[in-house]
């Protein structure tokens, strides 16, 4: 596909695989899906805009219970795009409210056949209350796995059209995951193993409800990622509306974004929308986590250094302000806000209060959605007291190292990030890596028994060793995996020519 088209087409893909989202305060889903098989991108965009406008108008009328006025608007939208999942679903709701139960079930079936799969929303939707005892409705619910599988297969087909034959594609029905990766089969297998283990651990530790829908996990090539995500510094994102996770590379960003996916499923099951400080706090908490047995154990990450420095400059936010932050302010001040939220979650985790806080928060959500009440309840402290205790705890933490230090262990190579490991860009002449047989272009994917997919994870692993230690690095070279023993050198004894060694 021409590079100039991929970003535009990918926007259509996002729309295509988007399922209905819960509208607030109405009970109707509001997201839009793509027009059917557009003859051209311009034509598709024109149809999308018209269908979206009609859909919004219909929802506004339905919110006011103006069913008679909403019906022709929805029918016009459906005529333009007979496979628009949200409009089909909303029309089913309208018919149910009118008492046309058989027709309502029929349109639910049409929506599901077109790709609508948000059965969590359906089971809570009061508009469908009159259908729940119908045999036809119960039969429809029994077909949920089939509808979801068919929808997932359509997503796979769409991804293949966007990214072509150089990617690997896989549908994991057991775990409800869809993969499109610019990696080899070994890396895809290890990614699946990591995400499966992460999900199992986070379900055991925190989230009560599992995925009830398929999530697409995309690891693009560097070139494709730059076309998809134009904003610098964004390593990945998760769109719950599209049930789509895209990461520039595996590693800490992938763990962060997949936590969002699992958290979103837990929120959806209870009909809640948690504030950004909780969502980003939980995702940041697990970024640098490593497994101890089957348990994913959080630990400090690079954000700690930033908030410690900000605290010395008196730039941290009072906790009372942090919990009230809306998304625009939080994102605008991401360096501090993400760091504070993640560190507060780690404080709760290490004081054995995280699960208690999260459960209490969900129970008291209707009383206080900010989290203030839950924090004060589980800690038995006021918010200012929590702030003071957390701050003292945080400032005593050891900063996260960005290098092994002047006399620390090194492999003797300049390193850069790839999408699935650490790329060897240049060897230090006569250094440990060169002596061990490493080559420019090798990709480091493991240190000793641990996976390593990004530089942020590499240094904390390497710092556990000292110069002179022999360590086995797992590398990929020309599609082959090699266990490479290497005797680590001392940084101060190497030529000063590289940034990352």
What are these regions (language model features)?
Residues 159, 165-275, 286, 290, ...:
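Juxtacatalytic substrate-recognition/specificity segment
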Residues 229-238, 245, 269-395:
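Acidic/His/Gly-enriched intrinsically disordered linker/tail segments
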Residues 391-429, 434, 464, 485-501:
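PDZ/PDZ-like peptide-tail recognition elements
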Residues 433-456:
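Conserved PDZ fold ligand-binding element
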């Amino acid at each position: 596909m021409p590079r100039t088209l991929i970003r535009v087409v990918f926007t259509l893909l996002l729309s295509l695989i988007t399922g209905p989202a819960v509208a607030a305060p109405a009970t109707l889903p509001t997201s839009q899906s793509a027009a059917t098989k557009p003859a051209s991108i311009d034509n598709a965009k024109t149809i999308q805009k018209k269908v979206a406008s009609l859909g919004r108008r219909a929802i506004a009328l339905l919110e006011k219970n103006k069913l008679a006025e909403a019906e022709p608007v929805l029918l016009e939208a459906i005529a333009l795009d007979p496979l628009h999942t949200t409009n089909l679903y909303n029309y089913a709701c309208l018919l149910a409210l009118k008492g046309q139960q058989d027709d309502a079930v029929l349109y639910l079936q049409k929506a599901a056949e077109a790709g609508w799969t948000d059965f969590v929303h359906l089971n809570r939707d009061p508009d469908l209350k009159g259908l729940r005892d119908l045999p036809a409705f119960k039969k429809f619910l029994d077909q949920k796995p089939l509808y979801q599988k068919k929808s997932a297969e359509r997503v796979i087909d769409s991804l293949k059209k966007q990214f072509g034959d150089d990617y690997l594609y896989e549908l994991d029905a057991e775990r409800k995951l869809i993969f499109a990766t610019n990696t080899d089969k070994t890396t895809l297998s290890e990614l699946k193993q990591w995400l499966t283990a992460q999900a199992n651990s986070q379900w055991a530790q925190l989230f009560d409800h599992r995925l009830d829908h398929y999530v697409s996990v995309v690891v693009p090539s560097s070139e494709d990622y730059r076309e998809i995500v134009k904003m610098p510094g964004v390593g990945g994102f998760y769109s719950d509306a599209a049930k789509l996770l895209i990461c520039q590379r595996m590693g800490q960003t992938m763990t962060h974004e997949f936590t969002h996916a699992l958290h979103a499923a837990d929120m959806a099951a209870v009909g809640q929308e948690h504030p950004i400080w909780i969502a980003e706090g939980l995702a940041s908490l697990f970024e640098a986590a490593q497994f101890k047995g089957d348990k994913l154990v959080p630990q400090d990450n690079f954000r700690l250094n930033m908030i410690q420095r900000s605290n010395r400059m008196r730039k941290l936010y009072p906790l009372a302000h942090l919990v009230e932050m809306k998304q625009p302010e939080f994102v605008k001040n991401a360096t501090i806000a993400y760091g504070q939220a993640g560190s507060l979650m780690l404080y709760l985790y290490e004081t054995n209060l995280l699960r208690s806080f999260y459960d209490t928060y969900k129970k008291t959500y209707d009383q206080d959605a900010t989290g203030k009440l839950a924090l004060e309840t589980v800690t038995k402290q006021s918010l200012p007291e929590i702030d003071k205790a957390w701050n003292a705890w945080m400032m005593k933490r050891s900063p996260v190292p960005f290098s092994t230090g002047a006399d620390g262990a090194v492999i003797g190579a300049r390193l850069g990030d790839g999408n699935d490991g650490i790329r060897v860009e240049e060897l230090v002449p006569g250094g440990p890596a060169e002596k061990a047989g490493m080559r420019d272009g090798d990709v480091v994917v493991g240190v000793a028994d641990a996976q390593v997919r990004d530089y942020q994870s590499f240094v904390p692993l390497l710092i556990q060793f000292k110069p002179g230690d022999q360590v086995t690095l797992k590398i990929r070279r020309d599609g082959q995996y090699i266990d490479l023993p290497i005797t680590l050198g001392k940084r101060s004894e190497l030529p000063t020519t590289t940034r990352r060694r």
